[in-house]
A protein has these predicted regions:
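Pyridoxal 5′-phosphate
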Residues: 1-373
């Protein structure tokens, strides 16, 4: 099998898995309990929180553990909207967002909130001039993905944060799910940031919402004591510790990982350019881990099935929104419905080998010739 769907899920790093097992075996106590086992568990999760904060260059008090980025996105967006409704009900986002963001906004729209989507430029980035036009005194939230999951476009997060300084009641939420582990990230000027471990070789079921100190959110879960007032319940110490290690490795090993991936991406672009019916949708400025393309007049789902039959795993749209509709992200950039329907995504890793790229190109060639005759 040739796995080229790392933006959907990454295999857990062996050291991360070992850390999880070690903590799970050695810390059986509840971190909320007032005895030796509970104290040991609390010390372990406190150390993990400190490590995560260092890796992200934020404060430990700003870390809220979640089950993943989808929960973090829902939590941040809905909580900010409810708590700021006395200032306004206007929210701005983009057509490039993950379904956990767009779905949260749809739910709020049904409750009377007004949602505007900012225009996307030809290179896939947010049109900052249009964003400035959309901002109003009653705008309470701007929600933007740092890196689009389908095209790999890097959004001008710092510029947006600077623009929003003039809007005292407008909060800024950034979905950093596809950014962490792919490029250096800065969270300056951002109110809430979501991320999840399974995108950077951690385990499924654990994520983080970074909440700027001083920002009030409505608790997601009410109940007993926990590591935070925002999400009550017994913390999963081993998952937190495993996320901390995965994040530490993702940050420290980033330069070497990216250098290898960039070379693979360049090789793919060169090889795919030889096929006249191939259109590369990811701009040259996209993160090298993501390469989106279309084969003219061949639905992405059809090409994906053909590759799957040959042992190659790729994605059509986000793994969380494979509903048979054209890619909103690709359509936003190309304004071509057929091209959006034909699009699919290759996502690379530092684990991807040169031989896998060779084998992929052979499988692609066979599928291309079979489907474009």
């Amino acid at each position: 099998m040739i796995y080229l769907d790392y933006s959907a899920n990454t295999p857990v790093d062996e050291a991360v898995l070992q850390r999880f097992c070690e903590v799970e075996r050695n810390c059986p106590g509840n971190a909320n309990s007032r005895h030796a086992a509970g104290t040991a568990a609390k010390a372990a999760i406190d150390a993990a929180t400190q490590s995560i904060a260092r890796s992200l260059n934020v404060q430990p008090a700003e870390i809220i553990y979640t089950s993943g980025a989808s929960e973090a996105n829902n939590f941040a967006i809905k909580s900010i909207a409810r708590l700021e409704r006395h200032h306004g009900r206007h929210i701005i986002s983009t057509p490039l967002e993950h379904s956990s963001v767009s779905g949260s906004l749809t739910a709020l729209q049904e409750q009377g909130y007004e949602i505007d989507l900012v225009d996307i430029r030809q290179d896939g980035t947010v049109d900052l001039a249009h964003l400035k036009e959309l901002l109003r005194p009653d705008t309470i939230l701007v929600a933007v993905t740092a890196v689009d999951s389908e095209l790999g476009v890097v959004q001008p997060v710092a510029e947006i944060a600077e623009m929003l300084k003039a809007c005292p009641h407008c909060h800024f939420h950034v979905d950093a799910t596809q950014a962490v582990g792919k490029l250096p990230v800065s969270f300056a000027g951002i109110d809430t940031i979501s991320l999840t471990a399974h995108k950077f070789y951690g385990l499924n079921g654990i994520g983080v919402l970074v909440k700027r100190r001083g920002l009030t959110l409505e608790p997601l879960i009410h109940g007993g004591e926990s590591t935070t007032i925002y999400r009550s319940g017994t913390p999963t110490v081993a998952l937190a510790c495993s996320l901390a290690l995965a994040l530490e490795k993702a940050v420290s090993e980033l330069p070497a990982r990216v250098e290898h991936i960039r070379a693979l991406n360049a090789r793919l672009r060169t090889g795919l350019a030889q096929y006249p019916k191939v259109r590369i949708n990811s701009p040259d400025t996209a993160v090298p881990q993501i390469l989106n393309l279309s084969v003219q007049n061949v639905k992405g789902t059809v090409f994906q099935r053909e590759l799957d039959a040959r042992g190659v795993c790729v994605s059509v749209k986000s793994a969380c929104s494979s509903d048979g509709l054209p890619s909103r992200a690709v359509f936003a950039v190309s304004h071509d419905r057929r091209n959006a329907l034909s699009s699919w995504r290759i996502s690379l890793s530092h684990l991807t080998t040169e031989q896998e790229i060779t084998d992929f190109m052979q499988a692609f060639d066979a599928c291309y010739n079979a489907l474009t005759q």
